[in-house]
Every structure is written in C-alpha cells, then in structure tokens.
From Swiss-Prot:
CDD domains: PLA2c. One of its GO terms (biological process) is arachidonate secretion. PROSITE patterns: PA2_ASP (PS00119), PA2_HIS (PS00118). This is Acidic phospholipase A2 Ts-A4. It comes from Trimeresurus stejnegeri (Chinese green tree viper). Belongs to the phospholipase A2 family. Group II subfamily. D49 sub-subfamily.
Length: 139
C-alpha cells in the first residue's frame, strides 16, 4: 500500500485529489498520468520552472497556475465529483473549492487530450532541469 501512495504522489500536478486526476487523464488520453506525464518537460510532475517546452508541458504549466488561484481549500486533499459526458468532463457538486480544483484538473486532462499529436515522450520525458533555466512565463 505504501508503494501505491508513493506512486500516487508522483502523479502529474502532484496536487488535487490525485487518483481522480489520474482517472480523468486516462479517460481523456488512454494514457496513465503517472507513466506518461510525470517527469515530462519543465512543468509536468513535481514543481516546475523555466519555459514550457511544448504544448503538453504548457498544459502542466497552466494546471500549476490554476492550482495557484484556488482559494479557501487545499488542492492536495479535496475530493470532488465529476462525470464524463459526450467525451468531455463535467465538474459537479456545490462546494466552490472542490469545483475549482475539478475545473483545474478537467482543463489539464482535456489539454493533454487535445495535444496528443505533439506529445513527445522520447524528447521530453525525464527532461533535464538544466534545460529549464529560461525565465518562466507569468501565470
């Protein structure tokens, strides 16, 4: 069980209700976030700095910015509700905090899906931190 928790912590974005975000990614891309998006580019995975390297890395940058704007709750722990409808994700529930987190995760999962054609595992997975030194874009 401890191994599963450690793996969950490594998921893309590192925050939010990780298993829900992972499920969103799988449903939208048919790829697992853990193996396809953690350690990708300069922003996918733990932390982030520099300039996003491609559209997928930009999805992670925008996701990080989105979490930074979440107010009055902890994006690392709040479980939210959502459904998959007509190939998209619909966030539900009445809690504004949880809905904000869900919307951040929804946007990232949809962004990953929309950029599968430029996703470059060979080039950007385990991308070197020394290549992420340029000044970051503002959120």
């Amino acid at each position: 069980m401890r191994t599963l928790w450690i793996l969950a912590v490594l998921l893309v974005g590192v925050e939010g209700h990780l298993l829900q975000f992972e499920t969103m990614i799988i449903k939208m891309t048919k790829q697992t976030g853990l193996f396809s998006y953690s350690f990708y580019g300069c922003y996918c995975g733990w932390g982030g700095h520099g300039r996003p390297q491609d559209p997928t890395d930009r999805c992670c940058f925008v996701h990080d910015c989105c979490y930074g704007k979440v107010t009055n709750c902890d994006p690392k722990a709040a479980a939210y509700s959502y459904t998959i409808e007509n190939g998209g994700i619909v966030c539900g529930g009445d809690d504004p905090c949880k809905k904000q987190i869900c919307e951040c995760d929804r946007a990232a999962a949809m962004c990953f899906r929309d950029n599968l054609d430029t996703y470059n595992y060979a080039k950007y997975w385990k991308f070197s931190a020394k290549d992420c030194q340029e000044e970051s874009d503002p959120c």
